[in-house]
Amino acid sequence: MISLVRTIVASTSLLVAVHASATPIGGIEFPQGAISFADLVVSYMPGSDVGGTYMGPAEALGMPDYNDSVQEGAVSLGKGGSLTVAFTDNSLTTSGDSAGDLWVFEIGSAVESFQVEISTNNVNWIDLGFVLGQPTGIDIDAIAGVNVGELYSYVRLTDTPGNQSGFPYGEADIDAIGAISSGHAVPLPAPAGFALFGLGLILLAVSRRR
């Protein structure tokens, strides 16, 4: 009997903890709160119509935090540009229903479209299609090629053809990328390319200060 009571108490505590961690962010409830959002910039190839504070890819990491008064907190894709990020303390997975699993927070007065893809390994990609909205929710369960229960660590956003806005915030401006349907973290490889990309960001920052 005591064992049964302990089991019930433990189960109740777990349910309370999960419910307590659910956090409304940008008007959308993320069950896992802050850890739901992308943590790592894998690659960033901006178009020519991006400059100033809008070409910092790390601005797309973490929870949405764009500050319109100082125009900081978002990164622009630019014409033909792309951004690839990864989840390191969680992953994106299916939900088993028609609700949005992946949410992309895009900012600005213009609602600009972009292509969204996901991957388990940063090599083989599944196209989720062209989307737009502020923010945009995508039901990955409805996408051909997405496997039930698969854990996706990578998200790639690519500008769609056509000029949607100009310098310095060309095309879609990304504030955050979050997984509502969040699975456990998957260990990611650390290829040399990641290190070289990080070095490139450091050199870019140094050159701006001169």
Where are these regions (language model features)?
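N-terminal signal peptide c-region/cleavage motif recognized by signal peptidases
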Residues: 17-18
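Bacterial N-terminal signal peptides that target proteins for export
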Residues: 1-8, 191-192
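Hydrophobic helical h-region of N-terminal Sec-dependent signal peptides
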Residues: 10-14, 200
